[in-house]
From Swiss-Prot:
This is Ubiquitin carboxyl-terminal hydrolase 2. Residues 268-600 form the USP domain. Cleavage is inhibited by ubiquitin in a dosage-dependent manner. Cleavage is blocked by ubiquitin aldehyde. InterPro entries: Papain-like_cys_pep_sf, Peptidase_C19_UCH, Ub_carboxyl-term_hydrolase, USP_CS, USP_dom. The lineage of its organism: Eukaryota, Metazoa, Chordata, Craniata, Vertebrata.
């Protein structure tokens, strides 16, 4: 006997009907309209009302809208048609809606509306399942990502056996040979999944009473796991192969599915959810950031979350689950980051929808959100206006850094935050005013004309060169107490462990925005930035490990990533779901937009 989820049955049910109306969402993604103009035509026509799968450009199971109640889902609160579920008895001829449960906010990533069963309505569940209080969930899309989630949450009461007797007696399975072949092929493809096989092994292949697994007692302290840990997150995986076979969501225990170190190389691709290449590019760069990767794989972030009294920790948790899934998947897997996107757009509503965004802005919002959730400072002290101008610049910089850490202290900041020194010197009296500010990245200007090729050091020198502030840009001198002509200069007071350099390729003017396509030659190793330090230091040499590229124009383009594995040291191209090896000589291109450098180990003292 073979066991088959009613999810497959619902999938083939909806595949028959192709006349469901479509609407254009406010975010540019076509989604199936659950309520067409002919919804109230006939109550007997409910069986003929199906849902189309989502188009290829969107892999979310339903249009997600996050924000004020005024822009929430237009279908919120409406009852959905209940699916037919075959199970131990003849299907009732009449259909009635159950009592509607209050729908969630949608921010949790759910994709369906649950409905209970009223005492007066006819139940479509088997008697055993009805006694257990099983509820049904109607999906708004029967796409492959829906099936992936449904396979990972199968219940024995929501399944039935496919045999010759049921084929002859059940009107819902009396399909044409073509439809039955399609159903059988889909089931066979799903049966090859190790996750569905584990389910059948745990719950048995016969229609027996459900076995309740013994709950695992909670551990006293967060367990520090090796980088080969397989997460228990719900990220859908897609295997490359014949017809892109469906693989179930990962929801397994660490001990059973631990992979060896050879297969855990972080070479899984990320599915494009619809103009989300900017997000995928940054996520792959961060996934290959050695210390951030270890922070997620070893679950060290749980210690910082446990010390935090904040209610919002979902972004860090989903980010860590995504990194864990990438690094515990085989190189042929493709991970869908839809759950992570749900949380980042909840933190930063500007990323709601599927418009193309800037990768640097996304990186800033993401790092800021992660930093806020794992900030070790529970209660920030009140800011004071202590005057430190009487101190030498080096001491003033250390005091300003100490004050910054009193308010902002996290593992994310330990990696990415540096300190920038800016000085203003009055040309009349010679008074020099210094300010120390933290930075997460440095935006470097590019020479616009006359130089078809520039070097990264040229960009750094252009960023730190003295700039004369005159005319309308004159600042007020504290000693002269008047607006005076001044000279501004930047230098780096404190170098971060991870230095992100942003090449300012997009130039804005009053008329239009243009893109600078000049080739910037940057070193892959031994980037020496000591000449830009505000004080003497011997620890300012960096090695490149990731590049976020932008190809195209300001009107439209595409983001990819070149990353060097922290395990093997080999370079790979990450183009959404496609991952391929590359040579280090191919890393330098005119599409380089964000450069990720790692501080080299200090030279050993003999």
């Amino acid at each position: 006997m073979s066991q088959l989820s009613s999810t497959l049955k619902r999938y083939t049910e909806s595949a028959r009907f192709t006349d469901a109306p479509f609407t254009k969402s406010s975010y540019g993604t076509y989604t199936p309209s659950s309520y067409g103009t002919n919804l109230a035509a006939s109550f007997l026509e409910k069986e003929k009302f199906g849902f189309k799968p989502s188009p290829p450009t969107s892999y979310l199971t339903r249009p997600r809208t996050y924000g004020p109640p005024s822009i929430l889902d237009y279908d919120r609160g409406r009852p959905l048609l209940r699916p037919d579920v075959i199970g131990g008895g003849k299907r009732a001829e009449s259909q009635t809606r159950g009592t509607e449960r209050p729908s969630g906010s949608g921010l949790s990533g759910g994709s369906g509306f649950s409905y209970g069963v009223t005492t007066s309505s006819v139940s479509y569940l088997p008697v055993s399942a009805r006694d257990q209080g099983v509820t049904l969930t109607q999906k708004k899309s029967n796409s492959q990502s829906d099936l992936a989630r449904d396979f990972s949450s199968l219940q024995t009461s929501d399944s039935y056996r496919l045999d010759s007797g049921n084929l002859g007696r059940s009107p819902m399975l009396a399909r044409t040979r073509k439809e039955l072949c399609a159903l059988q092929g889909l089931y066979q493809a799903a049966s090859r999944s190790e996750y569905l096989a584990d389910y059948l092994e745990n719950y048995g292949r016969k229609a027996s009473a459900p076995q309740v697994p013994t709950p695992t007692p909670p551990s006293r302290a967060p367990e520090v796991l090796s980088p080969t840990y397989r997460p228990s997150g719900r990220y859908s995986l897609w295997e490359k192969g014949k017809g892109q076979a469906l693989v179930s969501s990962r929801s397994s225990s660490p001990g059973r599915d631990t992979m060896n170190s050879k297969s855990a190389q972080g070479l899984a691709g990320l599915r494009n959810l619809g103009n989300t290449c900017f997000m995928n590019s940054i996520l792959q760069c961060l996934s290959n950031t050695r210390e951030l990767r270890d922070y997620c794989l070893q679950r060290l972030y749980l210690r910082d979350l446990s010390h935090s009294s904040r209610a919002h920790t979902a972004l860090m948790e989903e980010f860590a689950k995504l990194i864990q899934t990438i690094w515990t998947s085989s190189p042929n897997d493709v991970v869908s980051p839809s759950e992570f996107k749900t949380q980042i757009q909840r933190y930063a509503p500007r990323f709601v929808g599927y418009n193309q965004q800037d990768a640097q802005e996304f990186l800033r919002f993401l790092l800021d959100g992660l930093h806020n959730e794992v900030n070790r400072v529970i209660a920030r002290p009140k800011s004071n206006t202590e005057n430190l101008d009487h101190l030498p610049d080096d001491e003033k910089g250390r005091q300003m850094w100490r004050k910054y850490l009193e308010r902002e202290d996290s593992r994310i900041g330990d990696l990415f935050v540096g300190q920038l020194k800016s000085s203003l010197t009055c040309t009349d009296c010679g008074y020099c005013s210094t300010v120390f500010d933290p930075f997460w990245d440095l935006s470097l200007p590019i020479t616009k004309r006359g130089y078809p090729e520039v070097t990264l050091m040229d960009c750094m020198r252009l960023f730190t060169k003295e700039d004369v502030l005159d005319g309308d840009e004159k600042p007020t001198c504290c000693r002269c107490r008047a607006r005076k002509r001044c000279i501004k200069k930047f230098s780096i007071q404190r170098f971060p462990k991870i230095l992100v350099l942003h090449l300012k390729r997009f130039s804005e003017s009053r008329i239009r925005t243009s893109k600078l396509t000049a080739f910037v030659n940057f070193p892959l190793r031994d980037l020496d930035l000591r000449e830009f330090a505000s004080e003497n230091t011997n620890h300012a040499v960096y090695n490149l490990y990731a590049v976020s590229n932008h190809s195209g124009t300001t009107m439209g383009g595409h983001y990819t990533a070149y990353c060097r594995s922290p395990v093997t040291g080999e370079w790979h191209t990450f183009n959404d779901s496609s991952v391929s090896p590359m040579s280090s000589s191919q890393v330098r291109t005119s599409d380089a937009y964000l450069l990720f450098y790692e501080l080299a180990s200090p030279p050993s003292r003999m």
